[in-house]
């Protein structure tokens, strides 16, 4: 559910905030945590200051999340988090919608 995410990264406090429904036993939630850890590393390494927009950070996080899922579980990010490619294009775009 995009209106009630399982986890978010708070770059100001360097904290990953997880929803009460977060379940580390599921592949879905493990992959979401991985995604948020990527954001933590992006901010820790000042990658956020070298990108055109936040969409570039999301693109890298989803790409790495997909690679991790493929390697560890032989599944794609698309199938695991039920995200379609149109939504991916929108959230990784540097255009304003």
Residue ranges with predicted function:
Residues 37-54:
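Catalytic Zn2+-binding segment of zinc metalloproteases
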Residues 21-25, 29, 49-53, 57:
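Conserved aromatic-histidine-acidic binding/catalytic patches
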Residues 52-86:
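Post-HExxH zinc-binding segment in Zn-dependent metallohydrolases
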């Amino acid at each position: 559910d995009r209106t009630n995410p399982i986890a978010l990264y708070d770059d100001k406090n360097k904290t990953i905030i997880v929803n009460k429904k977060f379940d580390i036993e599921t592949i879905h939630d493990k992959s979401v945590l991985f995604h948020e850890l990527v954001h933590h590393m992006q901010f820790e390494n000042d990658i956020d200051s070298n990108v055109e927009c936040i969409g570039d950070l999301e693109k890298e996080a989803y790409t790495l999340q997909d690679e991790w899922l493929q390697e560890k579980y032989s599944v794609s990010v698309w199938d695991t988090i039920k995200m379609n490619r149109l939504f991916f294009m929108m959230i990784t775009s540097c255009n304003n919608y």
